[in-house]
Amino acid sequence: MSKSIIVAFIFLFGINQVKSQNVEHIVIGTKQLLHSKILSEAREYWIHLPESYHNSAASYKKYPVLVVLDGNTHFKYISGIVSYMSGIGKIPEMIVVSIQNVDRRRDFTPDKTITVRANNSGGGDKFISFLEDELIPELNRKYRTAPYRILFGHSLGGLLATHAYMKEKTLFNSFISVDPSFGTWDAKTMDKKLDAVTVHSFERFIYFATANWGKRNIRNRDRHLRLYEALNRKCEGEFPAKLAYFENENHGSIPPIAFYDGISAIFKDYGISFRDVDTTMQLMKHFQSISQRLSWNFKPPELLVNRIGYRMLRSRNENDTSKALEFFILNTENFPNSCNAYDSVGAAYEVLGNKKKAIENYKKALVLNPKSEHARMKIKNLNKSE
């Protein structure tokens, strides 16, 4: 069983403590506990849900999952970046899952390293099994998840994310590897891992970020560049990846800016402006291109399509009014359980003077959301005017 405990982060003049009983808590997530049979221990993870998740009108929505390693360090800022970027339509809304550490050297190192003193490195594959065979199934049971998953890791976490990307099979679709610690991967080890890479890795997207390590900078950059270029050569088509170097960031300061750049690279062109779209065909081709690059079917976001439709519905050009209906109908095809999609179709038919079709679609909206007073009032007023 998982135990849910509220995680409340209070931001009051930069102070994380409650100064008054009247202060309202700003809750950004919940704590969960999962008893792992694979790891033989209890593992804590934190969850941040999208803003629309608890909206009854959006109960049909399912969300991609972002799994964050070293979650105690990265949870707050990543949740904030995801919330902001999805709010302006640059990326999809997603569920953020941050894993709290128990023994990161054990969990994040794929290979056993031989040292003078005994160590417990080399548990990376076991930890990936925990993520894929226990954590993800639990998330699927408890939340409305879509089977598109991103793995974020920094330092040793970046090493594990890279290792997961290079495996024959994985449940993750994209990877953000921030300044990965490749110190245990000498040339021989790296070549061995590259030899084992199959075409399946190139059906995924990976982002690498490199920090400025000062005197050790050349060595660090060379390791990242060597792996990136070797993967690029091995990929027969266009390599779905990006490598970025941050001259002004060190190993400790790079994660926030690299996460922003990485998630932007994954969802490049996702945030197309509603003002730049003229036809449904243009929009569908745009998202087909994104889907092809990411090997996953990303539909045009409902909110984006709705905004395009209403822009055209309010246009003085009569042709735009008919085109608005096409966009609204597209939403009903992609999101058949959306009350708002049918409500918008009703609005378009109303402007076009087809009361029968308008009432028909408002009724569909009301069936999907019986609490929709807007649809109820529209039906009532249209029936009166007949």
What are these model-predicted stretches?
Residues S20-K62, N331:
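A domain-start/cap signature at the N-terminus of enzymes
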Residues N72-I128:
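Active-site machinery of serine-nucleophile hydrolases
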Residues P110-S155:
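Gly/Ser-rich "nucleophile elbow"/oxyanion-hole loop immediately N-terminal to the catalytic nucleophile
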Residues G183-E249:
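The feature captures the conserved acid-bearing segment of alpha/beta-hydrolase catalytic domains
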Residues R221, L225-Y228, C235-F298:
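C-terminal catalytic histidine-bearing segment of alpha/beta-hydrolase fold enzymes
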Residues F298-E302, T321, C339-N340, E373-H374:
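Helix-start (N-cap) detector for alpha-helical repeat units in TPR-like alpha-solenoids
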